Amino acid sequence: MSAPRTLYDKIFDDHVVDRQDDGTCLLYIDRHLVHEVTSPQAFEGLRLSGRKVRHPEKTLAVVDHNVSTSPERKFGIKNEESRIQVEALAKNAKDFGVEYYSENDIRQGIVHIIGPEQGFTLPGMTIVCGDSHTSTHGAFGALAHGIGTSEVEHVLATQTLIQRKAKNMLVRVDGQLPEGVTAKDIILAIIGEIGTAGGTGYVIEYAGEAIRSLSMEGRMTICNMSIEGGARAGLIAADETTFAYVKDKPRAPKGAAWDAALAYWKTLQSDEGAHFDKVIVLDAAKLPPIVSWGSSPEDVVSVQGVVPNPEEITDENKRTSKIRALDYMGLTPGTKITDIALDRVFIGSCTNGRIEDLRAAAKVIEGKTVNPRVNAMIVPGSGLVKEQAEAEGLDKIFLAAGFDWREPGCSMCLAMNDDRLKPHERCASTSNRNFEGRQGFKGRTHLVSPAMAAAAAIAGHFVDIRDWK
């Protein structure tokens, strides 16, 4: 009888093509997502060596990082470097026979949103992309992680990837979430608990009642930020919620193929007694709405808390780092989070740009008006999300309140397009990173949930969504 295995063990082992004595493995890759930023050199490498894309049908390309989200984007991209990257992806996809979603395609959007929408992402698969937030797809019980440009070329050419097996970590969130606390708060709390290096060398499996109770979109938010906790990937075992989400997607198996896939997917659970190298347990009932205060995703505190005092940190290097973060953020220890005034609000990204995120924001916003000193924008994660939101009338709620309603793309998550902060502007953002300069030179980012961001836009400062009327 074989030893009990974790979900990660099972998926990894099922995809090993070759294993060396030193533990290095060659893994078969089921799905490869490609965008304009990390792929040009990879395609050029194929071209120079006379190679083809080995499995174009397992590859899907989309523009997301550099595209404008302005309604005027049909007139083209102003920035020359960004325009060249977008044009290069269109040409490379055509030359190598890869399916491509341009900015004029209703299916276009952020790569980690369009994969699940199309059923390109399925349980039990190995999925890679030249993007760190590929871990998002782990919400489906898939082994998904980012790769570098040289690895992008390797996967395009061979449909395989050289890997070493990571260690197993279990993060269990027990109990039920309180009203007003979301998947975004869960993952920020986890990162606050383990730190941004806590998951280094691990693949995290998320489990527990609070995780199981989440929708697929909530689960994607959790897995999306696994990388911010230092992990290689994040996984949530597939269940009936997963199967219901996947079933009618365009690329999902049909008929007998669906039945066979379902039978296999149901085996992809961690066995009882499977060994985890590290276990973290959180009590969902004790989690508050969370706001980041510094320049690292681990710098988090309850919305009812205060900006911490770095002088109380005993580790000298960490203390110095947090003092720098406070200086960058323009904050003073002891300041109430609810006293922090805002200039900008961004609702979108591969973390929180899906239809449920927009519904949550609309529920808070309806009948209200954006604070006069706040510039607020909502960016749907894909053309299909935008279409659905408009069918539900959410755009009218946003526009009536004074929000900008944009075209799909990565937008203000990162300063690679026209949507960015000016120096010292302070932003409540539903994205995943609050690094220095992430949203623009000297821009100041606070990570929050969509409902918290929406309420902050109306109030002009952070408020506890649990008290929102």
Swiss-Prot record:
Q: Name one Pfam family in it.
A: Aconitase
Q: Which reaction does it catalyse?
A: (2R,3S)-3-isopropylmalate = (2S)-2-isopropylmalate
* Enzyme Commission number(s) of this protein: 4.2.1.33
State the source organism's domain of life. Answer: Bacteria
- Select a single GO molecular function from the record's annotations and give it: 3-isopropylmalate dehydratase activity
Instruction: Please list the cofactors this protein needs.
Output: [4Fe-4S] cluster
Q: What is this protein called?
A: 3-isopropylmalate dehydratase large subunit
Taxonomy of origin reads: Bacteria, Pseudomonadati, Pseudomonadota, Alphaproteobacteria, Hyphomicrobiales
Protein encoded by which gene: leuC
